[in-house]
Amino acid sequence: SFANSPGQAREQGRGDAIEGSALRKIRRNLNRNDVLQQPWYQSVEEEGKVRMRLFGRRLLSLLLQETGPRRRRQELLVEAHLLGREYGTEMSERGVTLKDTIEAFVFFRTMVLDSTNPSSWSRIIEAADRVLVGLADSYEERDPAITTLAS
C-alpha cells in the first residue's frame, strides 16, 4: 500500500522492518527446530511446501499488521478467516490431513510468537484463531463427516 503522509511512510517502513526481522527469526527457528523432521512437513510434497512458504509469508504479514481503529481490526479478522479457508482448502485438496494442517499452522504460529514482542501476542493470537476457524471451516465443507462424527 502507498503511504499518504510522512507519518504513514515511517509507520509502513517500521512495519516492514518488524516483518523482516520476524521473518529472519522464524527462518532461524525453523532451521533450529528441524522442521524437516516434523511429520506434517514430511506429509506434504514439494509443490505443497512451496505453497506453505507463500502462505506463511502472507500470514506473517497479516499477523504483524498494526490495526489501529476498531473497524480496521474487524477487516483484519475477516481477512484472517478467509486466509485460513484458502489455506485449508488448498491443503485438503493436496490430501494433507486436518491434523497435519493444524500442526503445521500451530508450529508456524509458535514461531511467530517466539519472534515478536509479547505486547503484540494477544493481537496475533486473536488473528491466528480466526485463521484456525477458517481452516476448520474449509475442511468441514470438503468433508461434512468431520462434524457429524463429533456430534
Regions found by a protein language model. Name each.
Residues 96-114:
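Elongated alpha-helical scaffolds
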Residues 1-87, 117-151:
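Core of compact, soluble alpha-helical bundle domains
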Residues 83-86, 90, 108, 113:
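Long amphipathic N-terminal alpha/beta scaffold segment
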